[in-house]
Amino acid sequence: MEIKAPGRILMSMINAIYGTGGFAREVMPILKEQCPNDENIFIVHKKYMHTQNSINGYPLISYEDFVKISSKDKNVTIAISDTAIRSKVSDQIDNSHIKQKSIVSKTSLTMDNVSISDGVIICPFVTLTSNISIGKNFHANIYSYVAHDCIIGENVTFAPSVKCNGNVIIEDNVFIGTGAIIKQGKKDNPIVIGANSIISAGSFVTRNVSKSTTVFGNPARVLSKSTLK
């Protein structure tokens, strides 16, 4: 199936990964496994277009040209780990009335009563246990897990091997670094990670994290000049 841009081309199925960074290139094989008979491509904003027109053998076109393609089924998944950028791109896609597709690895495990919103990426060897709500555009990188009775907001990023234990609420646009652990909260007193916060790699979070705060260490504490001494 040939991609030509600009122009309007009728296609049956086309799935696009927005982004061409390392994570996007890791996610593409998962998408191919999930949708082997579809046309799977990379897209970026036109100002970030590469000189080549393909990456790892997959077509690359601008988002602006992708919008012009006429297809019975056209989907986008945003594979950009930066939560603020992902939120802006998501709004752009919604304004174009294009569906955001979830990509879920066959080697991941999802248990009972798990609600997953649109545009989610669940990488290999991720576990979602029971009674969990997952917000739009959540990224769970390899070997991460979300345990029981957790609520995950929109545009949340789990780097590899993040461990979110039970009774935790993670608000929108939170980035959690590789190997971070969030201690289990209580049913009547969950641990809350505030919106737009950052949990540094290897941190052990034992209590609430305020909005727009960066924490690090074991136990996790607010990153400041005094705590770095």
Regions found by a protein language model. Name each.
Residues S102-F216, A220-L223:
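Structural signal for interior beta-strand "rungs" in well-ordered beta-sheet cores
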Residues M49-L109:
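Phosphate-bearing ligand-interacting subdomains
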Residues M1-M11:
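N-terminal amphipathic/basic-hydrophobic helices that include classical n-h-c signal peptides
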Residues M28-I30, I55, K88-Q92, I134, ...:
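Short amphipathic alpha-helical segments
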Residues L10-N75:
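A solvent-exposed beta-alpha-beta segment
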